Amino acid sequence: MCIRDSIYAAREAGADGLVFGALTPDGDIDLPLMKELMKASGDCPVTFHRAFDRCKDPIRGLEEIIDLGAARILTSGQQPTAPQGAGLIRSLIEQANGRIIILAGCGVNENNIRQLAEESGAHEFHFSAREGIRSAMRYSNPEVLMGSADVDEYLRNVTTAERVRRTIAACLGEK
């Protein structure tokens, strides 16, 4: 199994944590598979990833993931972005009552992290802090595309230290 092999490889490489999740075709937490993957994870902390946002019953799903022994759930509160899902994130945190960490993520940035913290009650956040960085290439042959016409081939999204700093500062209420 590919996922299990990746778990073993990550553990062997000294990973501090693992991130994965699995649902059944009907939108339930795939308990048999997750039990197998949790066993393969050993004592390495596991974050159940945003598959959680696609599960059909987040209340039951939360309890199942807690019972599996995961350390965290990464979620946008079953909405396109975590700020939009702040209400469910708050409900999950209250229901979890310290048994698992709810990690708010998706669309989190320096402009919304403080309000998200206040509205959701979350204490941990996942964010990419990406900015568009232009290529040093000055010449472009408009007749030849290397990919989709919808993508700017001379722009890369890169996590920048400055944006990470700004986002953390905003969360802490600093300038």
What label would you give each PLM region?
Residues 22-42, 55-61, 79-93, 110-115, ...:
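Active-site-adjacent beta->alpha loops and helix N-cap segments on the catalytic face
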Residues 53, 103, 122-159, 163:
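Active-site pocket-lining/capping segments in soluble small-molecule metabolic enzymes
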Residues 1-3:
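Short, small-residue-biased leader/transition segments that mark boundaries at the very start
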Residues 29-50, 86-109, 151-174:
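Alpha-helix-loop-beta-strand connector modules within alpha/beta enzyme cores
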Residues 6:
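Residues within the DNA-recognition helix of helix-turn-helix
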Residues 58, 62-64, 68-128, 155-160:
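Catalytic alpha/beta core domains of metabolic enzymes, predominantly
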Residues 19-21, 47-51, 73-76, 103-105:
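Short, conserved beta-strand edge motifs with alternating hydrophobic and charged residues
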Residues 9-27, 70-83, 120-141:
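Glycine-rich phosphate-binding active-site loops on the catalytic face of alpha/beta enzymes
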